[in-house]
Amino acid sequence: MTATDELTHNAGRYELSHLRALEAEAIHIIREVAAEFERPVLLFSGGKDSIVMLHLAVKAFRPGRLPFPVMHVDTGHNFDEVLQARDELVAETGVRLVVAKVQDDIDAGRVVETIPSRNPMQTFTLLRAIRENKFDAAFGGARRDEEKARAKERVFSFRDEFGQWDPKNQRPELWNLYNGRHRKGEHIRAFPLSNWTEFDIWSYIGAEQIKLPSIYYAHERKVFERDGMLLAVHKYLQPRKDEPIIEKTVRFRTVGDVTCTGCVESTAATVSEVIAETAISRLTERGATRADDRISEAGMEDRKREGYF
């Protein structure tokens, strides 16, 4: 991206490009949260959206240090490449990392393990960590184009004392005026990337030369098909007897638990190739590759009502 792509002069006015306008909006939201709340935290999964969000947060306060920690809710069923990228990024940026482990809640008897996916258990661990650390705001990397429940959620999304979201009782948001009012025990989820699309995310990754986990690009992997989705063979996820293992060139469009994240056949090995592929896609990444969203027609909304990301 060149300077002329970012800033144009039109009839005596300087105008930001679409991508730089999204960046400015996200940075404004991040700074607004930092100014308005006492103990914010940035939720970080190691996926492309949370990496872009962290990049924006660091940029928002440069040359100073990030004034809030980063938190990863660790199910224990992560892709190795994602954990490696997380640790490298934390070391490079110098941010403070808080890791909330689902395994700790299993060991303490606070939750009962669900087989094979621990995805539903993340909500309890997330809310426990927010409560124990007394966080009053949590940044999330959700985008409105991903899924219909996320499409109707506000940028500042209120959570009650139980961490629950009520989609029928959302606060009005006029222009860039955000209402963060809450009482003790309640908190706000803030979504700086609400108005971004998957195409915008990848365009920004290319423009800013942001490093991602290698699984976002084409690679050879042993997979099997289940319910029309390609799933990776892993120690936490094995095929059934009627599901043959095949080796394909694939990449991941979104990153979650090994047990519920599918991949797509692809030869896109560079950012520009992924951008070209994304431009012609007619399915969102969650719709195409997330088994956890297929639990029911309202699977995401039901989980968000309980306190999910």
Swiss-Prot record:
Pfam family, one: PAPS_reduct
Keyword Metal-binding listed: no
The reaction(s) this protein catalyses: sulfate + ATP + H(+) = adenosine 5'-phosphosulfate + diphosphate
Pathway this chain belongs to: Sulfur metabolism; hydrogen sulfide biosynthesis; sulfite from sulfate: step 1/3
First-level EC class: transferase
Keyword Membrane appears in the UniProt entry: no
PANTHER family: SULFATE ADENYLYLTRANSFERASE SUBUNIT 2 (PTHR43196:SF1)
Protein name: Sulfate adenylyltransferase subunit 2
Lineage of the species this protein comes from: Bacteria, Bacillati, Actinomycetota, Actinomycetes, Mycobacteriales
